[in-house]
Amino acid sequence: MRTVFIGAHEEPNGVNSYTYNLALELKKRGFESFVMSFGSCNKVTDYKGVKIKQYRTWGNTMTSIPVLYLKSLPYLIKHRKEIDMVMYQTVTFSVIPSLIVRLFGMKSSAIIHSLAEDSPKHGKMMKKLLMASMRLALAFTKNVVTVSCTKAKEVYNRYHKSCKVLPCGVFLPINKELNTDILEKNEIQVGKFFLTIGRIDPIKNYEVLIDAFKRHNHVNYQLVIGGDINNAYGRTIVERAKGCKNIIFPGIVYGDAKIALLKNCMAYCLVSSSEGLPIALLEGMSYGKIPVVTRIPSIQEVLEKYEIGLWSTVKNVEEVIANMIAIEKDFNTLKVQGKTA
């Protein structure tokens, strides 16, 4: 059986790592897997032995994914006799491409990581449009995979569509020498900073972390927010952090730079309003870091069975402040939570 995964970015991070790791697990179990990604150039490479065919696209993810889906069609049609399943990274943009591949005898499925209409950056009209497009897409998509039981319930309750659940996962870190100067370059203090890494989007509530950090005088500690701040929301949170030199924006972090931050932080923070199954949180847990999190279903699904985490309600600055202070005052006791994870 040969499965082709389509829709990953050239850097296997965040939600993209779900696609790469799924392909890798299939390969380990004796199945053929192949990834089609988008990036800055056309090339063929590999990820831990999984072949990757990369297509050059322009713009952001929202414009790159539909372009990739269309660019992949000639290859899929040409090699249709060798391909059993085509798995698309998103449902919404995959309707027409998946119909085409099915016409040529291949099976198709699509992944739901999160529901776009839940993001607070969208107004009422846009949310209605997103929900209408998702409803239409799901009507034409036979096989749907999602990343958590929580998300499967949300999709069923909202759209009456049943999904198969393939949970997110991350590889446990290995000890290796890191080739990065991210700590020195940004004057980040080892073991003295709160960390969050991810897509810079209003749904992540970074302003809550910033307000909590600024309102309590964290003189000896830092808050590090990793991600691409070159968008409207990014500019807003940078402006909000002004006047506090201990809030640091190192930009997009991959590879060794990301490992260095995860390895040396004191706690990993995720205060989102909504998540699929948060890979960023799993990465923080894999390094034994204390989770500072919001009480939302997808995070509860990950943490509550272990009875760990410092919890807050969504957008509650006071509770986040209390959690940060607790870590600073009682780090040696609370760090056991991270080790338990």
Where does each model-flagged region fall?
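Aromatic "clamp/platform" in nucleotide-sugar-dependent glycosyltransferases that forms part
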Residues: 273
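Conserved donor-binding/catalytic core segment of Leloir-type glycosyltransferases
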Residues: 4, 187-204, 210-214, 224
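A short, active-site helix/loop in glycosyltransferases that binds the activated sugar's phosphate group
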Residues: 139-163, 170-174
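Short His-centered aromatic/hydrophobic patch
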Residues: 88-94, 112
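Short hydrophobic beta-strand element within catalytic cores of glycosyltransferases
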Residues: 290-293
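Nucleotide-activated donor-binding/catalytic signature segment of Leloir-type glycosyltransferases, i.e.
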Residues: 235-253
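Conserved acidic donor-binding segment of nucleotide-sugar-dependent glycosyltransferases
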Residues: 305-316, 325-331
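Membrane-proximal helix-turn-helix segments that form the acceptor-binding/catalytic region
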Residues: 77, 103-104, 127-144
